[in-house]
Amino acid sequence: MMFYGWRIVVVAMLALGLSNGLVSYSYGLLVLPLGTEFGANRMLMMWGLTASSMATVLISPFAGSLMDRRSARVLFSVGAVCLALGMSLIAVSRNVWEFILVFGLLMSVGATLLGPIGANTIVARWFAQRRGRALGITAIGTSLGGLLVPLLLQTLIDAYGWRIACLWMAAIALLLLLPPIWLVVRNRPADLGLQPDGQPGAGQPTGVASLAAGSAPPRLMTDASFWRIALAVG
């Protein structure tokens, strides 16, 4: 019988694909039609992506802490709702600043909770000896999302215009994410009476340590090294 953890991997792939596909890979498809309608140049339109990157830097430490302490199923559901609500609000935005605000806040929260922080954390809990393989398969979701989501969004924009296309993507994200998240995602193998990898007595591999109390977000936010890395990445 297939180990339950592989179901977690499939949901994590889906979460990564849709979140990265909508936020990172599809942004460029919205720049031209929104800029044309709102009379904004491309430099101004790119502020949405800048705001999203800045928000992600600030949100990520807290998202990681929440993943350690709260239900992954609830946090993934919140992320899915944020993505769907964000796309819905973009569809009814009246000016470029509303678009930038929604993209920089709601879409960033959704992508952070459903992205590598959330997906990799939940997958790592379900695997020990096969953790590398499981994480590698999960990462495929990013590439698939980068290929399929922009293709679908562009098709919808060509057929219905960008506003209706965004509403369609909101509905698709909600329908594809919420049911499997709620039905499949569990915090740890122990919740179902299982062990990591599905093996009796399987445990954490040597060298895997828990997050130290001193690395909690409030202290991390004052760490100069953290900000240097964050600025280099984002």
Can you annotate each of these PLM segments?
Residues 50-57, 143-145, 233:
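Short hydrophobic/small-residue motifs within alpha-helical transmembrane segments
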Residues 137-138, 142-190:
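Helix-loop-helix hairpin linking two adjacent transmembrane segments in secondary transporters
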